[in-house]
Amino acid sequence: MLVRLLYASRVVDSSPETIDSILTKSRQFNPTSGITGILCYGGGIFLQAIEGGRSAVSDLYGHIQKDVRHKDVVLLHYEEISERRFGGWTMGQVDASRVNTNILLKYSERAELDPYSVSGKVSLALLEELMATASIIGRA
């Protein structure tokens, strides 16, 4: 059974090296676990969608909650799915500082990434629009 999970977290260290480390680890681990998804980051905040088998997604989310690089981890949305929306990426990435501010304003009160202030469904809609507008990079 496929599931999709969205979560938000604050990054402890927002240096490019830390972001690269997280993405590299994801891209190494995810293919062997059948995980796909997207990571959007900006202003020290992560918004991530993870898709895959229920056990694999649950295990990965458990690891993320314990990962010292993340704090304030919050589950935004969880659902059973019939197909993946982010199946083309072992972990696609979006740097929110490079996104057209009109896209962010469409889904939030301010032109910044803040999944803590919107619903999980709104966060999912934002990620889907970022995918549709080719804002996602890192097709590994």
Segments from the language model and where they lie:
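Charge-rich, low-complexity N-terminal segments
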Residues: 1-140
